[in-house]
Amino acid sequence: MKYIYIINGRADKAAKYEDFYKQLKENPHPYEVYTTMGEGDATRYVRLYCDLHPEEEVCFVACGGNGIINGVASGLVGYMNSGDPVASECDNKTIAILYFGGATQDFIINFPGRNFTSVKEMLAGAVTPIDVIQVNDSYCLNVCNVGFNSTVASRANELVAKGKSAHEAYTRGVINAILTSRFNRIKITADGERIARGPMVLCTVANGRRVGGEFNCAPNAKLDDGLMDVCYFRAMSLLRLLLLIPLYRSGEHIGSRPGKNRVLYRQAREVVISSKDLIDLYLDGEQLPGSRFHLKILPGALPLRLPKLETE
């Protein structure tokens, strides 16, 4: 098998790859390194490579955080889900993940006891199929969100681009969202049933458990159960929201006293999010503008190579 390591081409990421190249030398194996050339390039590259080399056994290794993981996975799932007979029978392509410090790591939190920084542990690992959420023509591995969370993400991304730390950016993003995003008029249906009427604070549709670097939005979510976990906050007073935010961080918001009659949690296979206005849906931290989003779960759609468990 050949491994193709896909790394972010941004100049400010270069210093983080020194240890990566050292590990490649210490663990000889067939590999190539591809450096992305811009937004969406990881997805395009993986899709094109699969089209041109359908018979080749390859593991595409996403090197970084949520964004590049989503890009690489979207390329492979998009290829396998394209309707092409050869692609739909594809069983010789997988993805793996190498995490570099500083990148957002919401997705790999779902796999405790595994070292995502080690090439050696990745090579010794095994493949397991995980679910993927399809969102219109895009794909999500971890969490989709609208309302409060998307306001936090939007503001945080602006601040990170200006050089603020991820923690400071998200803290300030939360403050901004508290002041501006408590009464969103967005309609959510799950498996054909409207979740609630009236304004809402937020809604997350989750495959994994954590979003935004610190919010444990879906503590019961599993990546291989064929279901999405939907968490919905009705509009509420500022005081109640302030009481809920710490619980939302820790994953204790479901069934909590401040969340009574305000926090709704259920599972679904299909979800529709719609609004009369243009809104931003964030999937794996990436912005997707629109007014209607159709989400459905694709059970076992992504073959993911996980690092060897540290206890093995």
Predicted regions: what they are:
Residues 2, 138-139, 185-187, 202, ...:
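Structural motif
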Residues 66, 133, 152, 203, ...:
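A residue-level signal for conserved active-site and pocket-lining positions in enzyme catalytic cores
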Residues 5, 33, 188, 230-232:
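Generic preference for hydrophobic
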Residues 2-164:
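Small-residue-rich beta-alpha loop regions that form the catalytic core of phosphotransfer
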Residues 54-55, 124-127, 179-181, 196, ...:
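Short solvent-exposed loop/turn micro-motifs enriched in small/polar/acidic residues
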Residues 190-192, 197, 222, 232-312:
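ATP/nucleoside-binding phosphotransfer catalytic cores, i.e., glycine-rich phosphate-binding loops
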Residues 10-11, 102, 207-210, 235:
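Short, glycine/serine-rich, charged loops/turns that create anion-binding
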Residues 135-227:
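ATP/pyrophosphate-binding catalytic subdomain of soluble kinases
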